[in-house]
A protein has these predicted regions:
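N-terminal regions that are enriched for targeting/export leaders
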Residues: 2-10
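Short, glycine/charge-rich beta-strand/loop segments that flank catalytic centers
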Residues: 46-49, 104-117, 218-220
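Flexible loop/turn segments at secondary-structure boundaries
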Residues: 49-52, 89-90, 111, 178, ...
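Structural signature of FAD isoalloxazine-binding scaffolds in flavoprotein oxidoreductases
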Residues: 51-71, 125-146, 170-177
Length: 245
């Protein structure tokens, strides 16, 4: 198989690699078993994770975009099972019309569940809800020998599957904890600040007023640290049935 040029998400970096497109878990397993001589494999879906870690020059990249199915929603237990290639955008479009939401999601809606787990990303609610890995209840994974098994939260291997960029396991499926929401809209406050102290004061103020989502964009060319602060909370009175992200 010839090497192909592949770019990172921002198209600022690239590499030449063999790219494979498996359609089943068995095909992924066979790729690993039949290419034991291969020095390095990397796995990608949307390719939007920080660090561009999937770039594998003169190696093999296994594309997991085919694994993009939502497998099960349990409204009673507030859980959902998805494949690794499901994008955050697709997940929210599925959940929110049903009155559910997911904590600790990144601002990049093209990110996939597998990438969010491997990078252990956080959202604008990180000060309250922590990281994306806190949503994960169990995983279906594959090891470097092509063997598939399930690991539950609390298992000794569980923590090594989250935030390790695929060095421990290939994530195939994830069972996630979801939360109820009564709205599909947010009330957003946007404020300018002229220095870092004012920014810190805004964070403290909005934390006390129970805005669960906060963030700031800072002008680093200004030594005083000016920028834009945003805080958001659910707009409970919304009657909107569906919103697309």
């Amino acid at each position: 198989m010839a090497y192909r040029k592949i770019f990172n998400w921002s198209r600022t970096k690239s590499c030449y690699a063999k790219i494979l497109y498996p359609k089943t878990y068995l095909e992924i397993s066979n790729i690993l078993k039949q290419n034991k001589e291969e020095k390095s494999f990397s796995f990608k879906a949307s390719g939007g994770s920080y660090g561009d870690c999937f770039l594998n020059d003169k190696g093999t990249i296994v594309d997991l975009n085919n694994f993009n199915q939502i497998l099960n929603l349990n409204k009673k237990n507030k859980t959902i099972v998805v494949q690794c290639g499901v994008k955050i955008q697709s997940l929210l479009n599925y959940l929110m019309p049903k009155g559910f939401y997911l904590n600790s999601i990144p601002g990049f809606n093209e990110a996939t569940v597998g990438g969010c787990i491997n990078s252990n990303v956080h959202g604008k609610d990180a000060h309250l809800e922590g990281v994306f890995g806190n949503n994960v209840l169990s995983l279906k994974v594959m090891n470097s020998l092509g063997e598939i098994f399930n690991i539950q939260k609390g298992n000794k291997n569980f923590s090594s599957a989250i935030g390790f960029y695929g060095l421990s396991f290939i994530i195939l499926e994830a069972k996630l904890k979801i939360i109820k929401t009564n709205s599909t809209l947010l009330k957003v406050d946007t404020l300018k600040f002229s220095n870092y102290q004012r920014l810190f004061d805004l964070f403290k103020k909005y934390e006390k007023t129970k805005f669960p989502m906060m963030g700031a964009w800072i002008n680093h060319f200004d030594n005083d640290g000016s920028g834009i602060f945003k805080a958001a909370k659910w707009h409970i009175k919304s009657k909107t049935k569906k919103i697309r992200f």
